[in-house]
Amino acid sequence: MAYPELDAADFLQQLARRKEFKSLISPPVDQKELIRDLRAHFVQIGGPGCEKGGRAFFPCDPYASPFPSIKGLQLHNAQLFVQNFQNPNTPYSRLLLNWQTGTGKSIAAIAIARQFMNHYMNFIENAPWIFVVGFTRAIIQTEMLRRPELGFVSYKEVAELHRLLHIAKQSGSTTSVESRHLNGFVSTLKRRLTDRNRGGFFQFYGYKEFASKLFNITSKGEEKNFDVLSLFHRSDEAEDTLNENDISQFVQKISEAETNGLIRVNQKIMEQLRGGLLIADEIHNVYNIQERNNYGIALQYVLDAFPPHQAPRAVFMSATPVTGSVMEYVDLLNLLVPRHELPNGQPLQRQQLFDSSGHSVKWKKDALALVERLSTGRVSFLLDTNTNFYPERIFAGKMLSYKDEKLPYLHFIECPMSEYQLETLKQLGPDPKISSNAYSIYDMVFPNPKFSKQTEPKAYGLFNSTETPTALSMASTDWLLENGVQIIEPSRRAPFNVSGSFLSLQPPTHISGLAFYSGKYTQMMKDILSIIRQGRGKILIYHNRVRMSGVLILQEILQSNGILNEVSSPVGTTRCSICAAIRDDHTHSDHQFIPVRFTILHSEIEPAVRERSLALFNASSNLEGHQLRILIGSKVIVEGLNFQAVRYEMIMSLPLDIPRLIQVFGRVVRKNSHMELPPSERNVTIYLYVSTTPDGGPELAKYAQKLKEYILIQEGDKALRKHAIDGFTNQIKIDKPMLESLPLSPSITPANVGATVLNTFEAYGYGEQEVKTISNIIISLFMARPVWTYSELWKAVSTPKLIQGITIDNKLFSEDNFALALISLCYSKNQCKELWIQNRLCTIMHVPAKPEHLYVAAVLNHKKEPVLDIETYIRDFQPPTMHSIRITKYLEHSQTKEPFQVLYEKFQKDFQDEPMEQVLIHYPASFHYTMLEALIIDNLAGMGALVEVYKKFFIAFSKKDIQPFPDIFKIISHVPGDDNTLVGYATEDSVRLITSREDKTWHEIPLYMLNINVKRKENDIVIGYMESKGKALKFKIRPPIQVLKKNEITDIRMLNRGAVCETRGREEQQKIANQLGISLNLTKISAIKLCLLIRNNLLQKEMEARNQPNGMQDGIRWFYLFNDKMPSLVHTS
């Protein structure tokens, strides 16, 4: 066997010596030394002193990164390691990726899968399948379809996908033509992954779906209420625990149940998995003791049902493989280690690893050594806190003690319970046990209708989720008013919730406010206001629950203290996102009032709505949080969701355990999550709130208990990782104590790896991959420096970390492979490798010279021939192109659209004598957006009348228009031109402001920052708008939204969404015209002309409404123009 077997005494040593693994030891390099290397090779392209460091070959940016880089996705060393380890050429059957959150587990799994797919493509028939199972399967699919480097889509298809995504977003509707185009395109790409006739090898399942499709309960089984779990769990125990006497027989038991006609195993799935690959994400979910399910049973069955040589290979992924209980190690190891390699060939049982007495559990003697032995060669472990890529994690607060014992790792914001909370807690007795329906006591209590005044002696609050809704719902109206409580109308998503001034920091004098009912939430609100006053930065608030004291009440607390949801309009008590002052008291002259807004994510919100809110929160235009400052999330955010540029995380309740708490931290501390922020702001401050009493309190006791359990889990984690396959490559990252890991000293270190072994490197094609890597490095070096000698180039290529993103050990590169890479890039008459270098189309030329041959980045002329002379690297020989105005990213997609140049010529011809306002309704959005950018960037002559129309409708903005908004004016103040110079225009979602005409760069701000309200009230008569119908734009009308909402529609087909005006009945057309005040003899006018009159009248009224004082904020809506977002019309009854 070319690779060592796992049971070899020196397995890790043999593995580490092979070049495909040894080269992934990232050599330590001092930053100052690295800058010296850059300057020695004259390739510093940015940073202080870059012109000198780069010999001024090309313009450089002193504020940019100094390192040349390779465009596109580059697998990091850990991803390359597992790709090389778990592939068809190695004998290793199962692997756990135990990687810190945000380090690229999904990309690693896809890279592994790609190797197997390439192998399966050589099968003539009965090729196996790759199964991807998990709650985050959609994320993995998304990664596959947005990364052309992974080999599932082309660069052109990714560009088309981005274009369709943008157009669909601009349409504002999930049922629009644009959205249907997008969905169709995505479906086509996804079918390529799963349809064998199209070259697909993948099957995607959720855990529940996989288990239910694998085990089909027959009608006989349903009659007998058969449950697959009954084969594996004792029915006579209170807790759901594995029946260890039966688990070793579970394959046989399934067969018996199948013979008895109770169950039918899906043989199609079994055959697809035979010799295939199984990828299971967030593997801890399949055996979590606290959440009973049959997910793990299904996985265990498909892994154990085959003979070893036919069983599927498996890749498991989790940042926290053991969560709810340390005893889950038994279940993890049974999945990770093939049955025949376990002790005595039988599944592990808990008594083999643990001593338990009551609720006390501890590791048995030698149990950790057994974990070390069984996990050798089956675990990849990665921690990464490199602040070049990850934000710094800062914990606010202090460490606390419980019963004189210091709690390890965590810092807390201590929140003493209010007197009312303490009085309520007394009702549970001296040593309270908090049941699952009493969790609100940790956070707050609610007013109790049993007491007319909550301040009277011995009064106590409500907290039980069964009793509280009933008691408050039955309270009298007078009591509710007296105590500042408002019952929110129940809905499917929120059967019960309350609001009112009792949640305010500053309630009316006769009402007890938030501080009376919750010390924790009072401190949270104070911290939020303090953060806002300190400056910019987005905030994520986490609570494990939705109802009672969970995210729904947090939403009401924010609203009761002047913070708006996504759609509400500001009022006098609304707070400013910049200074936290309320609107009525906002006297700051240095900034405009911008309301603080929040959004909310929980499992009962529709996925499409969650995705939209998340996208807005993460958008680059919301980097400072001025569109959405705060996101409140429940446990739905713990896995699979990523948040960008969050500066503050507030954790209001402990998730089920400490490993899940680590997952919550990982939502906001992710690789490159803060790269758009200045370096000084690339950090996340974490606030961990805990309610306390004079003797500690039940919530602190809960943390103390979970931390004790976590210490046991950490001991198991350390044993699991002791012989990690890549420990020797990650030594400097894993040898420090931290919350995620005890300090770990790998059994193999970089210093004792030994001599390099090349046999598998050369046999399995890694040399070809090295040639590709070197080629990419060469191209990057030529982008920084246009002329090299052979020896200079080889020295630069073999210098570690000279290229950003390449962290392998370049010193192990073969010079033969370097020569091959260089030859493959050099120009020949039969082959021209085209490169874009500093926006010039170039190729690399080999120039024979003495004493040493030169290699030059030569510019290509219009015939694609290299032009080589002393100034070749600065001469710009680009192929001649027709001059045309730039088509912007707002160009809408439709095969029937005419090119802009054609429409432009038509516009010049048609509107010589016509009212210029008509241009707004005769041309599509693509024309207008392109025209607007041409007016702003190219300053087209003879367009004064059109500019005035755009300005009258508040579509285009001059410097003068922006001056009343000082903070915004700073963005464009440097742009050349007088007060009347156009500097921006409005789209459906934002205002685009030009920042550089030369570079064609733009800055986007929300519409509301220029007092543009996208949800102006509609008039009570009729609404007009234009819609594309083939090449034509059709005028359509519909009733106003408020009229639609009043109508009781029982059949969704009768919902009046709008129709072409000419198709309306004559009576309806005349009625609308009369209501609009069109005073003509309508009986003698054709339907077409009547609709033209209605259209022009609505357009005129729209212009007049917009030009009223504050018209773009409060004016009545009559007509939706090309850049207006139409409201979604849906049936809600």
UniProtKB/Swiss-Prot annotation:
Organism: African swine fever virus (isolate Tick/South Africa/Pretoriuskop Pr4/1996)
Taxonomic path: Viruses, Varidnaviria, Bamfordvirae, Nucleocytoviricota, Pokkesviricetes
The Helicase C-terminal domain, residue ranges: 524-724
Primary location group: virion
Transmembrane intervals: none
Range of residues in the leader sequence: none
Gene Ontology cellular-component terms listed: virion component
Motif window: DEAH box: 281-284
Alphabetized InterPro entries for the sequence: Helicase_C-like (IPR001650), P-loop_NTPase (IPR027417)
Swiss-Prot/TrEMBL induction comment: Expressed in the late phase of the viral replicative cycle.
Entry keyword ATP-binding: yes
Family according to the record: Belongs to the DEAD box helicase family. DEAH subfamily.
Protein name: Early transcription factor large subunit homolog
Function: Putative initation factor.
Catalytic activity: ATP + H2O = ADP + phosphate + H(+)
An example Gene Ontology molecular-function term: RNA helicase activity
Keywords for this protein: ATP-binding, Helicase, Hydrolase, Late protein, Nucleotide-binding, Transcription, Transcription regulation, Virion
Binding positions for ATP per the UniProt entry: 99-106
Superkingdom: Viruses
Enzyme class, first EC level, given as a word: hydrolase
Compartment(s): Virion
PROSITE patterns membership: HELICASE_ATP_BIND_1 (PS51192), HELICASE_CTER (PS51194)
Domain Helicase ATP-binding as annotated: residue spans: 52-352
EC number: 3.6.4.13
